[in-house]
Amino acid sequence: MNLKLVFESGDPVLIGVFVLMLLMSIVTWCLVVLRCIKLYRARKGNAAVKRHMRDNLSLNEAVEKVRAVDAPLSKLAQEALQFYRNYRRNEASELAQALPLNEYLVIQIRNSMAQIMRRFDYGMTALASIGATAPFIGLFGTVWGIYHALINIGQSGQMSIAAVAGPIGEALVATAAGLFVAIPAVLAYNFLNRGTKILTQDLDAMAHDLHVRLLNQKDS
């Protein structure tokens, strides 16, 4: 099963399958590395934000301390406090009179959480698509390769096991390549999806804490 023979055969379809597999593998590993780095930094930053939020009784002081931290929880805390201040500054407006502070904060904090999580969704669709389609693309390459191998064998008239095993063995490499690309993509998708869920849980907990503290805030 020599890949060199596959490319030397000159079959454009089979060559295209292997080139596509190579590109999909490169995309997969680039996404895995970038997403893991981003997830690690987010968790590290979130841990620092949690410490500051616990150590400071004043929400204003806590938010000021976490302002320099690049983390989802920091962004959520800053935006939530800004929503509160905007509401207090415009209490005479029609919106403030029609919408209580409690409901206003719930709506705005939820919107903020959704925007923050969108930053961590990129690449997940690509990983899922690669994991789902790579085995079938590899299988297509195998079927195509076996079909042409049998045609060539029939035309040459050589029906020995050696004549059949070589070309068919080369075609089967496409299926192995599809699995080689798909398995890391599926494992990475599951791992990153779990990391994103943990991040969402952290945001939910922080949102609840911010909501309660802002409703009891006396000094904006």
UniProtKB/Swiss-Prot annotation:
One of its GO terms (cellular component) is plasma membrane. The chain crosses the membrane at residues 13-33, 126-146, 168-188. It is a multi-pass membrane protein. Pfam families: MotA_ExbB. Keywords: Cell inner membrane, Cell membrane, Membrane, Protein transport, Transmembrane, Transmembrane helix, Transport. It is found in: Cell inner membrane. GO terms for biological process: protein import. InterPro entries: ExbB/TolQ_transport (IPR050790), MotA_ExbB_proton_chnl (IPR002898). It comes from the Bacteria. Belongs to the ExbB/TolQ family. Involved in the TonB-dependent energy-dependent transport of various receptor-bound substrates. Protects ExbD from proteolytic degradation and functionally stabilizes TonB. The accessory proteins ExbB and ExbD seem to form a complex with TonB. This is Biopolymer transport protein ExbB. It comes from Neisseria meningitidis serogroup C.
